[in-house]
Design a protein with these regions (language model features):
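A generic structural signal for short
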Residues: 2, 80-82, 136-138
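A generic local secondary-structure boundary/capping motif
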Residues: 2-4, 106-108, 149-151
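Short alpha-helical segments and helix-capping/turn motifs at coil-helix boundaries
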Residues: 91, 103-104, 144-148
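Metal-dependent enolase-superfamily TIM-barrel catalytic cores that perform enediolate-based chemistry
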Residues: 115, 119-172
Length: 172
């Protein structure tokens, strides 16, 4: 995720802890493009926990998922609400897997593959190395894009997504 000034997001990590000490983790984010929603999103997360999950059996993730969907989406599902539902759903499945001492994929029918592809973004403005040059608007310098792409493939990424649209406030 790019820095906030480039249009990135604010991440929220959800930690659910059961009365038996099991911990489940989930995550969600709100895009900074939604402007000013950071604090209200945090309140939505807290309120959703209180309304739909607090005091409920975490070993019933499907029941709780449908409870959240019915209670949060009403007639219209949106990005923010489904991000919250997804974060709690992930945390609940994490708890179930720990309770039964098995990976979640076993609970969902077994492993489908033994590895997955990972991709990354290349935004219009890139830092070539930890202390290195920052390149703005690589669309004007394709050799920079080629060099960075090769480095990312060497790091293990098998897919690259190029975003030439300026992300910085000053237009790149």
């Amino acid at each position: 995720t790019p820095p906030p000034q480039w249009g990135g997001g604010t991440w929220y990590f959800i930690k659910l802890e059961t009365d038996t000490g099991l911990v489940g983790w989930g995550e969600t984010a709100v895009l900074n493009a939604f402007g000013g929603m950071t604090e209200s999103y945090k309140l939505m997360i807290q309120e959703s926990f209180s309304r739909f999950l607090e005091g409920k059996n975490p070993l019933e993730p499907e029941t709780l998922y449908h409870r959240m969907v019915r209670g949060l989406t009403h007639q219209h599902a949106d990005y923010a609400r489904f991000g919250i539902i997804s974060a709690f759903d992930t945390a609940l499945w994490d708890i179930v897997g720990k309770h039964y001492n098995t990976p979640v994929y076993n609970l969902l029918g077994g492993a489908y593959r033994d590895r997955i592809r990972s991709y990354t973004y290349i935004y219009d403005t890139v830092k070539m190395s930890a202390g290195g040059e920052t390149i703005r608007n690589w669309t004007q310098r394709p050799e920079v894009l080629a060099e960075l792409s090769a480095r990312l493939v060497d790091e293990g990424f098998t897919g690259l997504k190029f975003d030439p649209i300026p992300q910085s406030k000053d237009g790149g």
